[in-house]
Amino acid sequence: GVTGLHLHPSDIGGAILSVDRTDDWDAWPWAGPGWRDHIHTGVVQRISAVEVQAESPLAMAERWSEVLGRQNTDRSIVLDDAEIRFVEATDGRGEGVSGLELVAAQSGDFEICGVRVSLISDGG
């Protein structure tokens, strides 16, 4: 089976935090049946980091650290296969997701709706 806990930004700050658990990680029920047939990794392989901006990034990192049961190291929380980084809000948008880092076939940077996206080459 699968269970999930979703915490609203008013509870934890920054963004909705979804903490999900499944008996079989490879059979991700949230994605529906046959989701693996639709994976295309020729351009992007995975998300390696998300950046969340805050008025007080250290305080937000500590809150998230406590909820996730993971250590906050210099405003960064390392997960099993990715990282959450907390940075100062400087663009006037307030708290929220401010950047994504994706492992991709080619490197580059662009912006979508104020969110910076960094493509990090997989070296292939």
Give residue ranges: language-model regions:
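Vicinal oxygen chelate
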Residues: 1-49, 75-124
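Amphipathic alpha-helical segments
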Residues: 56-71
